Amino acid sequence: MEFYKGVLYESTGQYGESKLRALDYKNDAILNNVNLSKSYFGEGLTVLNDKIYQLTWKEGRGLIYDVNTFETLGSFNYGQSKEGWGLCNDGRQLYKTDGSENIWILNAETLEEERFVQAYTNKGRLTNLNELEWVEGKIYANRYQKNGVAIINPINGAIEAVLDFKDLKNKVTNHPGLDVLNGMAYNPDTKTLFVTGKRWDKLFEVRIIPAN
């Protein structure tokens, strides 16, 4: 998920069910919607310069759309990263995860993977990096099958803090298909983080207060 000019953009997954949607989060209205080919499993997205970049999981390809019309503008192939998981941008370049500890840095013009940084704590590497969000100069990343979000220095990959969202799962309706946290979007207008998960029936708005 990602906010762009006040609109919330969402990529959903599963083969045969993947979508790209634009939402008015205040009333849950769908402003635009496109279904992906049944051969694609939709993953992370980011919006830069009025273009939406959407990853697919194992297909080795990213999709490009016009942010206003959802017209398909093209696609790009992955390089050394073999899968598509999470995506964000800092206004100049794109950051991409592939399920490992690597955060790949893509040239915004050519979409080539130019280099990568690795996410590490003082105890070792942090693997299974998934959804990404650019927040005030830091990369927020959740880990696959975890309910926490790591705050990562984009220059050197150092984990500077971890946000624990496990209690949010207790606030959603319990059902057999309920899964873990898997979606977040930072709203720069309100400076709040919107958090949800796979098959959650709620979208939480969270304000992050730095520890003294």
Residue ranges of each PLM-predicted region?
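Hydrophobic, well-structured mid-protein blocks that either form specific transmembrane helices
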Residues: 62-122
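Blade-loop segments of beta-propeller domains
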Residues: 27-64, 70-81
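Conserved beta-strand positions in repeat-built beta-propeller and related beta-rich domains
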Residues: 10-14, 52-59, 96-100, 141-145, ...
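Beta-rich, blade/repeat-based domains predominating
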Residues: 1-5, 38-48, 79-91, 123-135, ...
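Loop/turn-rich, solvent-exposed surfaces of beta-rich toroidal or solenoidal domains
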Residues: 124-158
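Short loop/turn segments that connect beta-strands within beta-propeller blades
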Residues: 23-28, 66-70, 107-111, 153-157, ...
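Beta-propeller domains
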Residues: 9-34, 204
